[in-house]
UniProtKB/Swiss-Prot annotation:
Exchanges the guanine residue with 7-cyano-7-deazaguanine (preQ0) at position 15 in the dihydrouridine loop (D-loop) of archaeal tRNAs. The lineage of its organism: Archaea, Thermoproteota, Thermoprotei, Sulfolobales, Sulfolobaceae. The gene is tgtA. Belongs to the archaeosine tRNA-ribosyltransferase family. It comes from Saccharolobus solfataricus (strain ATCC 35092 / DSM 1617 / JCM 11322 / P2). This is tRNA-guanine(15) transglycosylase. Zn(2+) binds at residues 278, 280, 283.
Length: 503
């Protein structure tokens, strides 16, 4: 059955709808982890009031404590909520053997009827031994096969079953694990990457980016993709850019227990804050000093509620960036919040061709590009234009290159209109505009998006200027112009001598 539909795309990220037996969920989405046995921490009602219509809870804990005996929605009085159940894999990661089998936990989930269920995979975690990591991959594959027969027999339950991908930092194992889904696509309607939690705790964001890319690039694009344990706002938009559709985490409460205050750019110790940089209901009502004077139970709940508001805000900001076609710019903005986040951004740029492949060429309401520095050279629009120049067919023996200057015209559109006025009916040369980031823009296509819909800084970084010169030289070398004319190019340091070796 088709459970996932895409509404908007940007880079390899998307806004979509996940159809479940209890309703439709817009993605990217966050599933707060709730331990329903710990009612003194965060309740389902509080999750709902914050703005979540979904959560994840641990079926192993429910089974072990005989807490839910029938329909989980009815017993938790959450008929309108979308409920995902995890299988106990996290407990295996923490404690080792947990005394329950894969088939037992699958049958239990069939009994309590969550919207989304997970088989009992064997998580790789932060295993540094390749052979042991390999065992977790093949054991998880074995368990996926083992559970498939029961799942097929009970398809009337309309549970979305998740295929867990393991392998940890060993990307060849992640690839093997992801490829295994092809055998079960009619059974498992959702895929999930496991084992990033320990790496995220150690700020190894770039490694997690590698893992996500490897998993995503080895399954079909249309399959919704979940990231277990990905609950920090710092990494969320980068994971979304690669195509992660949903996340879960208990970070909001774990950090709260340790007096840690999550913002969209970093995590603070409560003791280090004089002011709250937030206007959620908690931060509007209390000061850091107020929270420090609370008893531990009250303080933990207050911090957890704030942390959830922050996570929800990050998802809204990420979706808005996708809707506007500005996800790349948003990632650039986020990248400078922490060196580990910048490392994640730089690692993401390693996969720029993958991002370009799925980035839409045409948008319903296109926005102008904001181009900043050398990192902007990796944007899909810039990559596509470079490929276009490689295919350009020379028409004349002469080339006239006008260098773009913001001092002459505020916008690229006005600048190229002035060029048209200058050349009037002259038709003796191929006319181009030299623009940082783009390299050369043929005048005849300069009206097309985004070639006249962009903003660049007044001062251009040297590496961007060097890139422009390289693109121009490469273009001239590929063609056979008998005469090269440069107009108004002194400010960009472009002159005949600098390109003469290309002719």
């Amino acid at each position: 059955m088709t459970v996932f539909e895409v509404k908007y795309e940007d880079l390899a990220g998307r806004i979509g709808t996940l159809r479940t037996r209890s309703g439709t969920l817009e993605t990217p989405a966050f599933f707060p982890v709730i331990n329903v046995l710990k009612k003194d921490e965060i309740s389902i009602d509080e999750i709902r009031n914050i703005g979540f219509k979904n959560f994840i809870t641990n079926s192993y804990i429910l089974y072990k404590n005989n807490y839910i005996k029938d329909d989980i929605h009815k017993e938790l009085r959450s008929e309108e909520m979308i409920i995902m159940t995890d299988s106990g894999a996290y407990q295996i990661l923490e404690y080792g053997e947990i005394g329950i089998t894969n088939l037992q936990i699958v049958n239990y989930q069939l009994k309590i009827k969550p919207d989304i269920g997970v088989i009992l995979d064997l998580p790789t975690g932060n295993i540094n031994d390749y052979d042991n990591a390999k065992k977790t991959v093949y054991e998880t594959l074995k368990r996926a096969e083992e559970a498939s027969e029961i799942i097929v027999k009970n398809q009337d339950n309309n549970i979305i079953w998740v295929y867990p991908i393991q392998g940890g930092r060993y990307l060849d194992l992640v690839k093997t694990s992801a490829e295994g889904l092809s055998k079960f696509e009619h059974i498992y309607n959702m895929a999930a990457l496991g084992s990033p939690t320990v790496l995220l705790e150690k700020y190894m964001y770039d490694t997690v980016i590698d893992m996500i890319y490897t998993a995503k690039s080895n399954i079909k694009r249309g399959i919704p993709f979940h990231l277990f344990g990905g609950g920090l706002p710092h990494i969320i938009p980068f994971a979304v850019a690669l195509g992660v559709d949903s996340f879960d985490s208990a970070s909001y409460i774990i950090y709260a227990r340790d007096n840690r205050y999550i913002t969209r750019t970093r995590v603070y110790k409560l003791e280090d804050l004089e002011y709250f940089p937030c206007s959620c209901p908690i931060c509007s009502k209390y000061t850091p000093k107020d929270l420090l004077e609370m008893n531990e139970k009250e303080r933990t709940k207050a911090l957890a509620i704030h942390n959830l508001y922050t996570i929800l805000e990050e998802f809204k900001a990420t979706k808005q960036a996708i809707k506007e076609g500005r996800l790349f710019e948003y990632l650039q903005e986020k990248a400078y919040s922490h060196p580990a986040v910048y490392s994640a951004f730089k690692r993401l740029m390693k996969y720029k061709d993958y991002l370009e492949k799925f980035d839409p060429r045409i948008r319903g309401d296109p926005k102008g590009l904001f181009l900043f520095d050398g990192n902007s050279l990796h944007r899909p629009e810039i990559i596509r234009h470079s490929r276009f120049l490689e295919r350009y067919i020379q028409k004349k023996d002469k080339i006239s290159i006008y260098c773009y200057d913001k001092a002459i015209s505020d916008t690229a559109y006005d600048f190229k209109e002035k060029i048209r006025e200058k050349i009037a009916d002259r038709n003796e040369s191929d006319v181009f505009i030299a623009v940082p980031f783009f390299g050369l823009i043929p005048l005849e296509i300069s009206d097309s998006y985004p070639l006249s819909q962009f903003e660049i800084p007044n001062e251009i970084d040297e590496d961007v200027i060097d890139d422009m010169k390289t693109k121009i030289i490469s273009f001239l070398r590929r063609n056979n112009y008998q005469k090269v004319e440069l107009i108004n190019c002194e400010k960009l340091g472009l002159h005949i001598d600098s390109i003469s070796t290309s002719s």
